[in-house]
């Protein structure tokens, strides 16, 4: 689905600048390898948005006091790096922010306020976070995008350092995405597969079934037998 993925990346770019549209999704760019283009895409998006219009908030910070105050004056969340092996204990604010629901925002040395974030979020990941929340309410808010390319040995460093900052390049990108007619982000098959991997990572029962289903000889097995294997 190369063409679908190309279209998706264009539409993600458009979602960043059309931040008042209720996308109800956050984008998670996933790749365990480096040199895959995540950082370059983020650099392009930062150039499009302009300095001061985005915040860098890792996933683990959404459940911490005072970490969300920058959202009061930005239109986007762009995070290049999240720690590998991240355990996310609280996702209430994360889910609410993705879908534009109200949150209580605690501010340092100031009274808390009720706040609704109207922007768009993109997070870069090297592996799947381990969430305490296993519910589908979190899963349906995630658009997991596998970044399968690897440019090691053929890097074009000038693209990130210079090209994506050129005025004519930014004008072209902005013109293209603002003339695309859509109000939902598509979900290619490879993105659905990536979300399934994230679900499996966060559900020990799914992990177990993925391991044993292909090696079971019988089509029907006693549940007590499966439970003994699971233990």
Task: State the predicted function of each range.
Residues 1-231:
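Feature primarily recognizes SF3-like P-loop helicase cores of small DNA viruses
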């Amino acid at each position: 689905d190369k063409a679908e993925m190309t279209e998706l990346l264009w539409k993600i770019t458009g979602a960043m600048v059309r931040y008042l549209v209720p996308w109800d999704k956050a984008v998670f760019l996933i790749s365990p390898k480096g040199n895959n283009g995540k950082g370059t895409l983020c650099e392009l998006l930062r150039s499009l948005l302009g300095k001061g219009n985005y915040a860098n908030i890792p996933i683990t910070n959404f459940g911490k006091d005072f970490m969300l105050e920058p959202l009061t004056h930005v239109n986007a969340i762009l995070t290049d790096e999240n720690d590998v092996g991240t355990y996310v204990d609280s996702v209430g604010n994360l889910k609410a922010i993705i879908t534009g629901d109200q949150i209580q925002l605690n501010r340092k040395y100031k009274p808390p306020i009720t706040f609704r974030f109207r922007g768009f979020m993109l997070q870069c990941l090297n592996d799947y976070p381990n969430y305490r929340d296993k519910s589908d309410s979190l899963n349906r808010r995630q658009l997991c995008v596998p970044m399968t390319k690897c440019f090691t040995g053929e890097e074009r460093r000038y693209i990130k350092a210079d090209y994506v900052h050129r005025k004519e390049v930014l004008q072209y990108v902005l013109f293209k995405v603002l003339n695309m007619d859509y109000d939902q982000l598509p979900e290619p098959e490879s993105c659905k597969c990536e979300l399934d991997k994230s679900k499996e990572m966060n559900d020990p029962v799914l992990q177990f079934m993925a391991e044993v289903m292909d090696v079971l000889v019988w089509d029907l097995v006693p549940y007590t037998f499966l439970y003994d294997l699971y233990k």
